[in-house]
Structures are given as C-alpha cells and as structure tokens.
Swiss-Prot record:
Residues 1-20 form the signal peptide. Keywords: Secreted, Signal. It comes from Caenorhabditis elegans. This is UPF0375 protein Y45F10C.2. One of its GO terms (cellular component) is extracellular region. Belongs to the UPF0375 family. InterPro entries: DUF1505. Expressed in the uterine epithelium. It is found in: Secreted. Negatively regulates the egg-laying rate by promoting retention of fertilized eggs.
Amino acid sequence: MNSFVSTVLLLSVTIALVSGYPSQLQTTCVTKAKSCTMFFLNGVYCTECTYSGTLELKIGSTCTFSIYEKKVASQPNENSQNEVAQCKQSSCYSNQYVPVDCAAAFGNEYITYIENQ
C-alpha cells in the first residue's frame, strides 16, 4: 500500500510540473511611433498627431501581424477619424489585411503602450 501511495504521489507531482510548462512557444514583437504636424487653419494653430503601432504574435506555427493607427487633431473637422483607432490584421505570411477590432487584435495593454508616447 505504501508503494501505491508513493507512485500516485510521484505521478501527481509529475503531471503538475508538466502542466506548468507552455505547450507551444510564443513570441511577441511590438513597435510604436508618433508623428505630428502643425498647421495654421482659419487663424488658429492646429496639430494632428498619428499614433501607430504593429504587433507580430507567433504562437507555435500560427503567426498574425496587426497594424494600429489613430489620428488625434486639435481642431477636428466633420470628416476626421479623430480619436477612433483603425486596426487591420493578416497572417504574417500574407499582405492581405482585414479590418479588425483593435481591442481584439492588440489588447488593452498594447494599446496603452502605443498611445502613451
């Protein structure tokens, strides 16, 4: 009976240790940039800044590439996409992008990282 308990205990510890290891390798690469232009419009100085970023996420053999862009203007006009982020995503091995929800593609942590410049 004692050897049975030892065997069960050894198997339980082995399963717990193995389950703690990731089954697939995950790598992440994030870039960010900010560019601003200043201009004079109707007697007022205005600025327009573009926040952009990319996220390459590889999990095992699956790889996605996401692009984030957000324009912020000091004097928005009715046609601007002010404060609305635009995101698109593709496979790392393709250049055919589809629009995606930014929160789904990047997550709040990476969006905050890109916008805090």
